[in-house]
């Protein structure tokens, strides 16, 4: 498995049809919760005061992460930063 730290900043256009906005957000929530339940998205944290999150993904590869992110319904409205992670030599676990 490969771990990734992912920051997602969302910027939905103000002129987006409200119905489309609501449907997209509902689809995003369902998709992300499915990934959380599967263990592929074990951590998600809101950044206070922003429409942003910091997430940890536990996936097979960078290719799998790419597919997951591209399938996010809000992907077209996101700026995403990805950092691959590895175990730290001083970790006591």
UniProtKB/Swiss-Prot annotation:
One of its GO terms (biological process) is beta-ketoadipate pathway. This is Muconolactone Delta-isomerase. One of its GO terms (molecular function) is muconolactone delta-isomerase activity. Belongs to the muconolactone Delta-isomerase family. InterPro entries: Dimeric_a/b-barrel (IPR011008), MLI_dom (IPR026029), Muconolactone_d_Isoase (IPR003464). The gene is catC. The keyword Isomerase applies. It comes from the Bacteria. Keywords: Aromatic hydrocarbons catabolism, Isomerase. Pathway: Aromatic compound metabolism; beta-ketoadipate pathway; 5-oxo-4,5-dihydro-2-furylacetate from catechol: step 3/3. It catalyses: (S)-muconolactone = (4,5-dihydro-5-oxofuran-2-yl)-acetate. Gene3D superfamilies: Dimeric alpha+beta barrel (3.30.70.1060). The keyword Isomerase applies. Its EC number is 5.3.3.4. It comes from Rhodococcus opacus.
């Amino acid at each position: 498995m490969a771990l990734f730290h992912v920051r997602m900043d969302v910027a939905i256009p103000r002129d987006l049809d409200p119905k489309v906005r609501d449907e997209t957000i509902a689809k995003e929530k369902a998709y992300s919760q499915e990934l959380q339940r599967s263990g592929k998205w074990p951590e998600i944290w809101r950044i206070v005061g922003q429409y942003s999150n910091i997430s940890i993904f536990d996936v097979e590869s960078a290719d799998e992460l790419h597919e997951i992110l591209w399938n996010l319904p809000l992907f077209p409205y996101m700026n995403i930063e990805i950092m691959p992670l590895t175990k730290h030599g001083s970790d006591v676990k």
